[in-house]
Structure formats: C-alpha cells, structure tokens
Design a protein with these regions (language model features):
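Alpha-helical transmembrane segments of multi-pass small-molecule/ion transporters
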Residues: 1-293
C-alpha cells in the first residue's frame, strides 16, 4: 500500500516542484496562462468530462451529495475553531470549506484510479467551484453580488455539461468537436500543477501559526465528515476512493484570489493556502489509504 500511495503522490510532487524551480529561476508572469486555464481550458475539461461515454451523471449523485456535505460540514466544524483562535470566520472558514480539488484533486484522481476516475472528479470540482463562486463569496463578503456568477466560464461549462450529460441519449456532440474539446481540456491537469508550483515561490509565511492551524483543520475536518457519512451512503469503490481523496485535500488557491478581491486579510489566507498545500504530503496519503483500502 505504501508504494502504491508513493507512486500516486510522486508525479504530483515532481510537477509542482518543477513549477517552483522554474518560478524561482525565470520569475514568469503566469497571469495570462492562469486566466486562459480558468476561462477556457478548465471549462473545456468540465464539458468533456460530463459528455464522455463512461460518465453517467445520475450515477454520481451520491458522490456529489457527499462532496457538498464535506464542504458544508467542514465549514460548520471550522467556525467555532475560528472563534476560539481569535480569527475572523470570514477569513478562516472559506479556506477550510473549499479545497484544492482542481490543481491537486484532478491529478490525484487520475494517478490513483486511472482515466475512469477523472470524470467524477471533474464533477466534484465543478460542484465545489459553483459553491465557491456563490456561497463562498457571500461568506467572505456578505454584501458581495453574485449576479455575475452565471457569466463565469466555469459555471457556464458546468451548466452546459449537466445539460449535455442528461440529454446524451437524445443528442451527442459530433466526434471531431468532442475530441477538440477533450484535447484542450486534457491540458488542465499538468497546467494547474505547474502553475501551483510557480505560485508557491511567492508565498508569504507572515501568519505561519494560523497557516499551520488551517493546514491541519481543512483535511482533518473533511476526513471526519467523510468518515461520518460514508457508511450511510451507498457508493461504489471508485466513488468512495474519490470521496476520501477529495476530503483530504488542502485549501484551494482560489481562496486567496477571493480574499484578495474582497480585501479580507489576503496575507493570512495566503499563509493558510501555502502551508496547507505543503501539508498535503501528510494528509493526502491518509485520504488515499482510507479510500484505497
């Protein structure tokens, strides 16, 4: 089991490390690539996953509902911890709820379960993103407007993907169009990992105490919720494995972008995100062990 987990984690770590080394040496401006990834490439991955022949949306509802429960349950568990530690819940709670199911979760799903694990992992990623751009933004800034959420490419891709998936028996995309979408979307996984490595070279450890607390609470809360609900929800072995990987993931980089946009202590959130992603070396193997056993 140890060698299997190591073989899953190693490619993820090496690609992130390659991004970090390149970032330290070349100091690239990744803003254009990151924007293209979020606006075009990742949405194509969502659409291609939902319409793939091996993916049936109705068969994934239990997994997706469990994913929603982990997001909400982690927030409920994190709220009193934020109060007790003297942190503003608007700063601390969202990073505990919304994890790195894109940059790290998608590659782990592929390396752990093969290509058959990608489509349901993308569905989890899409649902988590939809919650982040609505509930997550409101938690950080209760006055924020979410009217523009339906103009977000990821949200549009999710809605389109759900529609195409549920109408697959009536209409399918022409094969050349599907292959074009899939080819572009397949670039998401390595780009996200490499970009995460580049971003980590600029990390701020000013709030390292809060960062270590968040690094532990995010995966622990997720795994606790997963352990509580998994015995009562019927799932396949693949779905159970994906659920525990999802539960063990660190805070998403997107939390920093949302905090920065809303001026909600972005430096503290940056520390939580950085140390959380470093701590993935500890908690993701635990999630893999629970999901693979």
């Amino acid at each position: 089991m140890f060698f299997r987990i190591a073989s899953i984690i190693t490619p993820v770590v090496l690609i992130i490390f390659a991004g970090w080394v390149y970032g330290r040496r070349a100091h690239p401006d990744m803003s254009g690539i990151n924007k293209a990834t979020l606006d075009v490439i990742a949405p194509m991955l969502v659409v291609s996953a939902f319409v793939s022949k091996d993916f049936e949306l109705l068969e994934q509802w239990n997994l997706l509902l469990c994913g929603v429960a982990i997001v909400l349950g982690s927030g409920i568990l994190a709220w009193p911890i934020a109060r007790l530690s003297g942190m503003d819940p608007k700063t601390f709670v969202p990073p505990m709820m919304f994890n790195n199911c894109g940059n790290m979760g998608l590659p782990l799903a592929v390396f752990a379960f093969g290509t058959v694990g990608l489509a349901p992992a993308v569905a989890l990623f899409a649902v988590s993103n939809l919650m982040h751009f609505t509930l997550g933004v409101k938690l950080v800034n209760p006055k924020a407007s979410v009217k523009g959420v339906f103009a977000n490419p990821m949200v549009i891709a999710t809605i389109l993907g759900v529609f195409l998936s549920t109408t697959k028996h009536l209409y399918t995309l022409p094969e050349p169009l599907y292959q074009s979408i899939k080819l572009l979307g397949d670039a998401t996984v390595p780009l996200m990992l490499f970009s995460l490595g580049v971003r980590m070279k600029d990390a701020n450890l000013k709030h390292w105490r809060e960062g270590f607390l968040g690094a532990a609470i995010c995966p622990i809360a997720g795994l606790v919720v997963a352990l509580l609900i998994s015995p009562f929800i019927p799932m396949t072995d693949l779905q159970r494995g994906l659920l525990f990987v999802f539960a063990s993931l660190p805070p998403a980089v997107l939390n920093f972008l949302v905090a920065d946009r809303n001026k909600q202590d972005p430096e503290l959130v940056a520390s939580i995100v950085l140390l959380g992603n470093l701590s993935a070396m500890i908690f993701v193997p635990i999630g893999l062990y629970l999901g693979l056993k």
